[in-house]
Amino acid sequence: MKRILSITLGLILLLGFSSCEKWLDVNVDPDNPNDLSATPEIRLPWIQHYYMYAWGTANMRTSTIAGIMTQTTSATGGNSRLAAWNPIQGSSTTIYQNWFLGGAVNLKPLIDRATEQGAYHYIGAAYCIRAMGFMMMLDLYGEMPYTEALTGKYNPAYDQGDVIYDGCLADLETAIENFSKTQEPGATALSEGDTWNGGDVNKWLRLCYGLKARYLLQISKKSTFDPAAVLAALQNAPQSNADNIIMKHYNVEGDAINFTVLDPYQTNTTWDAAAYGTGQRFTRWYANLLTNNFTGGSGVTDPRLPKLLPAVMTNVELNSSGNIINYEWKRDIGVDMMNSDIRMNGGPLNYAYANSRQTFKYKIADEAARTAFIAAVPHPYTVSADTVIVTYPRGAFYVNSTNYMRAGDTAYVNMRSNSMSTSGVSVTDMYYYLNADVKAVGGTGSFFARPDSDSEILSYAEMCFIKAEVYLRQGNAPQAHAAYIAGIQASFDRMQTKLNEWKSSGTINPDQMPMDDADIAAYLASAAVVQSASNLTMADIIQQKIIAMGINMQVWNDMRRFNYSAGNIGSFGVVYRDYKRPKEFTATNIIPGTSPTELNYWFRRFNHSTHESNYNNEQLLLSNPLAMKDPIWSDPVWWDKP
């Protein structure tokens, strides 16, 4: 990828816009590339990149809606308001923008140039990514210009979800057809422009069939849902972790910047959205999946937990020069979005490192609250009437606020990892330092959201959990259980592979080191994993699928398919145990349902972006009776309706 992006970097600005124009087929200057001179191997990596940026942003924003992640401040910014289920239109723009302006606009020119030379594998890649991009648009926005999109029409009509869905499946078939062909002599090899699979056509075919299985499962609410068709597609989807579709990413110094959003090009796109800054936190509900602390849970801690939930230094000891000589790690506990009013009281706030002694006076009028606060204070304190005076020694981690309710916000570790573009120390040291001079670590990062984390576009583990769900729907518990166990094992194996890569690279971060094999074996044999096929539930399958998928928009897609925690899909009962709407939720004008069994009780889709409402508003308003009205956010997209 690094080589491909370096070669083509200087072309991207021109290509993204010249593909919208009609150019004369004469006097093409190779030193000044345009729509005609942009060959397939130059276009493809940029289509892949901009699709991935849209996908990474969607991963973060949908994971926030799904209650996997939240933000540090009260509901003000667009993404923070997603956590409160009180969204604004601004959250709808980046995904749309990067897919259409960076990626989709280049698909037809790529197909045209590839057709001229018989480069069938590039045609296959274009149709596969077209299916992925427009399915993402359907998943998020519902109705969308599709058949008239990218045709040059200034006001393309909208298509309904079934048209987009059928078109995406048809595009996958076209992709499979082209990948199955032998390229014409002299055609550019796919390996020269493919940043996902390195030109491995068999992996592209695995991707197409895996996507087909995913999409066929996605209509599980529809009368046309065909479990046998899902299983048939899975036969040609990834069969092991060796078949995983992964985009590698790199933490490099001097990386060029994405022109649409000003983020580094080569870093992980989910990191760009979720862990570039200090505002993101995991939630308690997600943490409880890893500790199995939910209704009916075993209480067994998952060995993947320290790889997924970040940690911060605590109990720091300094020498006379102020350098850290000893410390312990404190693991993130997750922000309880469903049961606590923490964000309604201004939290959680970011923490700081005490370069010198800091003293704070906390006025606590309520005696019980004051007593509880004193019992929890780990630092020297005095009490004067209703005021507790706490002294934070040099080297302590503290919250710069006199609000006593915020003093404990150090328990919520932010997700940030530093890259070489964001104050990073080295390509292998991605700690978030509060003070880099003394190496005061404010966060160890998370497996799926570091600058050089792999993007798992489609994984064998996901295929296993799809298979487990389908077999359970068919009443075949033994096969469902076998697939469930295989999915858990695949998740561990995949993580171990990446963790060993990080270890070999020279990282010093313990959260990037491999897990202990004995811990994995003990977990797999524990009550945290269903040991008998007869006891397997859909909730068990989905819990493990969430953990394996990480920060991924498919988590929200699945959540909608099962109506969140309504418990009214088939005989599966409550699939998302202990799940609730955010405690701070008040936006009944947007999500007006009053009962969990009502579809509009839950967050169901995104409103359209300003690109559509500003420039194609007439067609937008014709697309849905709720278009551009508040309740559109709770209107199910096509596949989410029975």
Label the predicted regions.
Residues R3-G10:
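Sec-dependent signal peptide recognition
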Residues C20-T73, N86, L231, N323-E328, ...:
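Membrane-proximal, proline-rich intrinsically disordered regions
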Residues L14-F17:
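Bacterial Sec-type N-terminal signal peptides, specifically the leucine/valine-rich hydrophobic h-region
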Residues A38, T72-I466, V470-L499, S534-L536:
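Structured, solvent-exposed acidic/aromatic patches
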Residues D200-V201, R214, A274-Q280, A287-V300, ...:
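Long, intrinsically disordered, low-complexity segments
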Residues C20-L24, A75-R81, L138-P145, S504-D519:
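Short, compositionally biased low-complexity segments
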